[in-house]
A protein has these predicted regions:
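Structural preference for solvent-exposed beta-strand-turn elements
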Residues: 1-297
């Protein structure tokens, strides 16, 4: 394929694609998924080495195979794809979103509540479950559900994000929000993404005691967070602020929630069904003073 980068956009052109050997220097979900989709109708054999092993990578391969693709090894370090000429329609049930489930697990912990989360695959949640149990949260596992029961107090721990089956980077901000009120110190190490601590300044507005040095955040637990106006800087940062707000004292206003809506369907509706006092409001056009305040956020 030929490609060019123009104004932040990547333009690709090819009369046809040909199978090849791909080695990823860094384990990456997005690149693995794109390589799989590009290879299913390419001529010949494509071998992807150091492939991501996340459950949704396996699920994509299973879905494509049900459409006539020839994919072997999804969920291992090496995926082999022999291109086919045609794909056909299928009926397929997508696996539950383990990050959405994990976020509600974090909410139960932060709010010291009791939540039963249905339609999940508990095995996919094990890294999250283990950390929650370690800090003092009670988690009960069923065939396709988990019950999370928050405790009266939590204790600090260390978390390091890693590719699957390690602790997922997409749960790092939400777990950090829980740890802001855990006794003692916690250390959160982000080994996958840069700039994954952009939510820290917003949690500080709520009273969190967090210091960041490079890829490591040190959290000194406080008794309780306090509501404040904060801004969602990205999808998981916004989720972390919701986690924090539901355990905080007073009212929290979260701006730029379009980031959250990109990855969570009807979140405020689900939270209200659990008894949360939360509502989505349309913002009027800001005054000049409000614009300055927003800029300061």
């Amino acid at each position: 394929a030929e490609y060019e980068i123009d104004g932040g956009m990547v333009n690709l052109r090819a009369d046809k694609l040909v199978g090849t050997q791909i080695f990823f220097d860094k384990n990456t979900v997005g690149a693995t998924i794109n390589a799989i989709m590009a290879s299913v109708k390419a001529d010949g054999l494509t071998i992807i080495e150091n492939a991501a092993k996340e459950p949704h990578v396996v699920d994509l391969a299973n879905c494509l195979n049900s459409m006539g693709a020839d994919i072997l090894g999804a969920g291992t370090d090496v995926i082999k794809i022999r291109g086919v000429k045609y794909l056909h329609g299928t009926t397929y049930s997508v696996i539950p979103d383990q990050i959405e489930a994990g976020t509600f697990m974090a909410i139960a912990a932060a709010a010291r509540s009791n939540i039963l989360i249905r339609n999940v695959i508990p095995k996919h949640l094990e890294p999250i479950t283990q950390k929650l149990v370690k800090i003092g949260v009670q988690v009960e596992q069923f065939d396709d559900a988990v019950r999370v029961i928050g405790g009266p107090e939590y204790f600090g721990t260390s978390i390091k994000t890693n590719p699957h089956p390690g602790f997922p980077t997409d749960m790092q901000p939400q777990m950090a929000a829980v740890l802001t009120c855990a006794k003692g110190a916690s250390m959160v190490t982000e080994s996958i993404f840069d700039n994954r601590f952009r939510y820290v300044d917003e949690l500080r507005r709520m009273g969190a005691n967090i210091s960041v040095e490079g890829r490591v955040a040190v959290i000194e637990g406080v008794e309780r967070l306090k509501g404040a106006p904060v801004k969602a800087t990205d999808l998981r940062a916004g989720a972390a602020l919701i986690v924090a707000a539901l355990g905080a004292e007073g009212v929290t206003e979260i701006y730029d929630i379009h980031h959250v809506e990109r990855g969570y369907e009807n979140m405020e509706v689900k939270l209200r069904s659990l008894g949360a006092d939360i509502q989505k409001v349309d913002e009027p056009d800001p005054t000049a003073e409000e614009k300055l305040l927003r800029k300061a956020l």
